[in-house]
Design a protein with these regions (language model features):
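Non-catalytic, topology-defining segments of multipass membrane proteins
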Residues: 1-191, 218, 228-254
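Glycine/small-residue-rich hydrophobic helix-like segments
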Residues: 194-239
């Protein structure tokens, strides 16, 4: 793959600035939603949060793309589609940053290590990092992923603008519940895993963070065995994404 194509796939720092700009607008829209939404609209937002946070990020981007969970091609594409609506960055960049995190975990080179960058910085800017494509070379051969990588920001910009226009035109908050609100919830609950899922000794497990992040809070277990896709049992009772994997995606996953 040529360096020119890699540059188009990466687009840093413009991509990083665009990501922060999009999520900043989504925060404003979420505040608007919180002040005006009905209980039904909140329920829709939570359902979409499950789609983006569990199906998309915890399973799709994390356990499948980053760590090799096996499933059918149709299911794989659906999970990636869900993850691409979470507004945490395009898939190839996200995978590269996450694998770099594993490579340099809890060192000054960790892209989002709270001991070196600070918990507040990690919570707010955990994905503001230049991805090194060498950590995702297997991703750039997939045309489905490269198309998402190229059009990710224009796609989300269109969704944001459409959501604002439809909300103002109809007076219904449901349009924000479908995109902006679950994106913000996914951003912050996912960031909790890195900002507060660490101690001075390294990654740590948290039932509370796991409940908020669909099972991603078992951070120490994950770092001990990154290729494990399911964390269940008495040490990890709140791995909702693991239950989804075992029940609907790959019953043989471990």
């Amino acid at each position: 793959m040529t360096s020119a194509l890699l540059n188009r796939l990466n687009l840093y720092p413009h991509a990083a600035h665009a990501l922060l700009g999009l999520i900043a607008v989504a925060h404003v829209l979420t505040l608007w939603f919180a002040l005006n939404a009905s209980w039904l609209e909140w329920m829709i937002a939570v359902a979409c949060w499950f789609i983006t946070g569990s199906l998309g990020m915890a399973i799709g981007f994390h356990r499948l793309l980053s760590h090799g969970l096996q499933t059918s091609d149709r299911c794989r594409r659906f999970l990636i589609w869900c993850g691409c609506h979470a507004m945490t960055g395009p898939p190839i960049s996200w995978v590269a940053i996450h694998r770099e995190h594993h490579r340099y975990s809890d060192t000054p080179l960790d892209p989002h290590g709270p001991e070196h960058k600070g918990k507040a910085w990690v919570q707010l800017f955990s994905m503001y990092h230049k991805p090194s494509i060498k950590y995702a070379k297997d991703m750039i051969r997939d045309p489905y992923l490269t198309q998402w990588q190229k059009h990710y920001f224009s796609y989300h910009m269109a969704l944001i603008v459409t959501g604002i226009v439809l909300t103002m035109a109809t007076g219904s908050m449901v349009w924000l519940a479908l995109h902006a609100v679950p994106a913000v919830l996914t951003w912050h609950t996912g960031s909790l895993v890195n900002s507060f899922g660490h101690s001075e000794h390294g990654a740590k497990d948290s039932h509370f963070i796991s409940m908020l992040s669909w099972g991603e809070g078992y951070h120490q277990l994950h770092h001990q065995n990154p290729k494990a896709h399911v964390f269940l049992g008495k040490n990890a009772p709140f791995d909702v994404s693991g239950l989804v994997i075992k029940g609907f995606i790959n019953k043989d996953a471990r």
